[in-house]
Amino acid sequence: MKLFSLKPVTNSYDMVEWDILSFAEKIQPMLPSNQDACMFLLDIHMNNDSLLEYWPEGYELSFLPGYLKDNYDISIMDGFIALRMNAYEALKDLLAPLGEFIETKADGEPIVIFNLRTFGLEDEAKCEREYLDGYPLDYIKIAFINDDVKNKPVFKSKFTGGSRLYCTDKFKSAVDVVRM
């Protein structure tokens, strides 16, 4: 089994423009009174929180003009996966047990934002971390325990705050089959 790091296509654009600050203002009234919306959104991947329950009814996004030129059906966006409808239809059964689908629109076109809520178990002995003057920085190599991730086509790592996504060859093959 091969594992891959999911990253945006080099020199590409995110699918949608998502103004997180204005979004935070919209969801603040729906959050518990002691929860700051900006902190909630900053920590959503690490805390494995649901976004679906707070998604404002009728909230729409906009396609980024550069994205429309590339016209991909999938966009990896800081811990989320944005899917156009044909990508969603092709991948929904594979992704459904791993997170939540948030149906919305971008410029009137139906799209789905996938909030991954599945962690892979890291193999700490094989992970490598960068240090500066003895202080830990980012991980430069992440390894996972194969028995844990073999049935998780897409997953995230606690070592990266949950915002970097990883996948198995099963997910990669599913994407390749429909050429998204």
Segments and roles (model prediction):
Residues 1-180:
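Phosphate/anion-contacting hairpin/loop surfaces
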